[in-house]
């Protein structure tokens, strides 16, 4: 949303731009939370790309604690609720850009309302997690979900001296993000720093007011704190009946990122952008993807018919796991198979520098390539 506002104000001289944010903080980057929790970024307010004044100094308006609750296409208005006093007003628009984002999933199991069951998304949770990492009373930490967020959380608490158990339904940490050869490289590091319980089903949480253990189909896991990172769902319930959604709640857009409602566009984590290697829309919840979408929409927002469609994205991201640093682009074994594509992989290992350089200054480099064996298209 902020990227759209900045781009609009930079590109056009005669636009009135207003940003509404339901939360009390603008543009918190959850992907940077690990840096804050490890004290590499000293202030939680610094974990963001934009501040309200970045928009305001260009002539725009930013309202935090203001939730857009409804769209009225026939009048080209939205209902805005001021969450500080519960007052509402109708606001006119000529063009509307939706960037409503996603909400972390809460596991629908008994005990999910116990204290000390945390999520890892947003500024408020960052503060709670920082307190927990420094709390000597919290000794056993269970992380539910072994994707990017879960592995980041497991590293934070392991470095804080906690006994960490990382668990997931999948058979290996990061199993949906990296090819198997890279997982082979990483797995010993995970096992050295924490307990792994892979291929387990979470059946509930046990405790008396506060969580004491995680109930799984393979036994209970002691936990003074549980961090749940079990995926996300689009924040789109408020759009039902007005904006077309798919069966899972993602906003449907055409190739120009327009919704079914005239002059209403959608960008960000709540849509399914075109994946170039997959050749179809798929979830790619990355800030870089959203920024490309925002730039495209702003470039064409006043055209009756854009002269080109949104070209799509590859989906590139990076992750550090203890002493390893990974970057990925496109599809891997898991996502290629999920999209029913023909694929093979190739793995290469070498040192960064010539062999005569001492080992301490000559780290290993690992490359895993996913490709279509028939067309030779590189998938990721």
Where are these regions (language model features)?
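Conserved N-terminal Rossmann-fold NAD(P)-binding element of oxidoreductases
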Residues: 98, 144-145
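Glycine/serine-rich phosphate-binding loop and adjoining beta1-alpha1 elements at the start
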Residues: 73-74, 87-128, 132-134, 139
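Rossmann-like dinucleotide-binding cores of NAD(P)H-dependent redox enzymes
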Residues: 47-48, 140-142, 148-204, 284-290, ...
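Hydrophobic Val/Ile/Leu positions in short beta-strands of Rossmann-like dinucleotide-binding domains
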Residues: 19, 119, 143-144
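FAD-site-proximal beta/loop scaffold in flavoenzymes
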Residues: 113-137, 206-215, 220-299
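Beta1-alpha1 glycine-rich phosphate/pyrophosphate-binding loop at the start
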Residues: 1-63, 148, 155-178
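Mid-to-C-terminal Rossmann-like scaffold of FAD/NAD(P)H-dependent oxidoreductases
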Residues: 270-380
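A Rossmann-like FAD-binding core segment of flavoenzymes
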Residues: 14-16, 56-84, 90-91, 159-253, ...
């Amino acid at each position: 949303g902020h990227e759209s506002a900045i781009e609009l104000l930079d590109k056009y001289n005669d636009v009135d731009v207003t940003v509404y944010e339901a939360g009390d903080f603008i543009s918190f980057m959850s992907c940077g939370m690990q840096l804050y929790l490890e004290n590499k970024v000293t202030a939680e307010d610094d974990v963001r790309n934009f501040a309200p004044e970045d928009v305001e100094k260009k002539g725009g308006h930013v309202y935090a604690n203001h939730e857009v609750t409804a769209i009225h296409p026939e009048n080209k208005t939205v209902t805005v609720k001021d969450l500080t006093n519960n007052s509402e007003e109708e606001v006119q628009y000529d063009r509307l850009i939706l960037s409503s984002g996603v909400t972390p999933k809460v596991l629908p199991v008994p005990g999910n309302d116990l204290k000390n069951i945390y999520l890892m998304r947003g500024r408020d949770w960052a503060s709670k997690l920082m307190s927990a990492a420094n709390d000597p009373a919290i000794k056993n930490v269970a992380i539910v979900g072994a994707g990017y967020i879960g592995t980041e959380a497991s590293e934070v608490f392991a470095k804080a001296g906690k006994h960490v158990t990382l668990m997931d339904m999948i058979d290996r940490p990061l199993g949906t993000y990296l090819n198997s050869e890279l997982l082979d490289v990483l797995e010993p590091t995970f096992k050295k720093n924490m307990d792994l319980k892979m291929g387990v089903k979470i059946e509930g949480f046990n405790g008396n007011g506060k969580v004491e253990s995680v109930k799984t189909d393979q036994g209970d896991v002691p936990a003074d704190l549980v961090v749940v990172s079990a995926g996300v769902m689009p924040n789109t319930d408020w759009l039902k009946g007005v904006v077309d959604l798919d069966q899972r709640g993602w906003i449907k857009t055409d190739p120009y990122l327009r919704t079914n409602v005239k002059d209403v566009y959608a960008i960000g984590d709540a849509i399914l952008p075109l994946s170039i290697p997959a050749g179809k829309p798929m979830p790619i919840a990355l800030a870089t993807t959203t920024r490309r979408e925002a730039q495209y929409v702003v470039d064409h927002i006043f055209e009756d018919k854009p002269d080109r469609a949104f070209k799509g994205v590859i989906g590139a991201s990076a992750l550090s796991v203890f002493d390893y640093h990974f970057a990925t682009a496109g599809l891997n074994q898991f996502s290629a198979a999920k999209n029913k594509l023909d694929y093979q992989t190739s793995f290469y290992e070498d040192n960064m520098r010539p062999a005569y350089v001492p080992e301490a200054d000559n780290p290993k480099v690992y490359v895993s390539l996913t490709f279509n064996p028939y067309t030779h298209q590189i998938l990721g």
